[in-house]
UniProtKB/Swiss-Prot annotation:
InterPro entries: ATP_synth_OSCP/delta_N_sf, ATPase_OSCP/d_CS, ATPase_OSCP/dsu
Residue pairs linked by disulfide bridges in the UniProt entry: none
Membrane topology field: Peripheral membrane protein
One Pfam assignment: OSCP
Residues spanning the membrane: none
Protein name according to UniProt: ATP synthase subunit delta 1
Gene name in the database record: atpH1
HAMAP family membership: ATP_synth_delta_bact
Organism: Vibrio campbellii (strain ATCC BAA-1116)
Amino acid sequence: MSDMTTIARPYAKAAFDFAVDKDQLDQWGQMLSFATEVTKNEQMNELLKGSVSADKLAEIFVAVCGEQVDAHGQNLIKVMAENGRLTALPDVCEQFFLLKKEHEKEIDVEVISASELSDEQLANIGSKLEVRLERKVKLNCSVDETLLGGVIIRAGDLVIDNSARGRLNRLSDALQS
C-alpha cells in the first residue's frame, strides 16, 4: 500500500461519510473527480509542488474549481491544503469511489475470454456472479486468444480460471506431482 493511499484514506472516509449523511454520493463523486482533474493541470501541479502558502494555494485551487465544488468540498480542499495534502487528492478520489462501490454493493469483474462473448453469455455470467457475490456486477470484458478456450473471471480476490490453458496447466501440475 502506498504512502499516498494511507494519507488519502481518512480524507476519503470523511468525505464519504459526509456524502452518505447528506445523501450526496454522486455529487461528491463529481466534485472529487473534477478536483482531481484540476490537480493534473501542469500549472496547478507546479503550484502544488511549489512553496506557495497553504492559504494562497487553497484560495487558488478553490477559484480554479469555481462552482464545480460546493462549500463543503471547498472546506475539504482548504483542510487538505492546510495539512499540505492536496497532492493526495487523486488518491482521495480513488479511495472515495472504492468506498462508494462497497456501499452500493457493486463490484468490477474482469472477464477474459478466448473469443468474443455474446450478449446472452455475458448476461448469464453477470447474473450468476451477482447471485454468488451478492453484489451488483459490472463486467469488463477482454479477449485473450492464448487462452485457447473458456474464460477467466476476476472479481476482487476471487479468480475463476475455466480456460483451456488453465485446465491444461492444472493437469500438467497433477501429472508432475
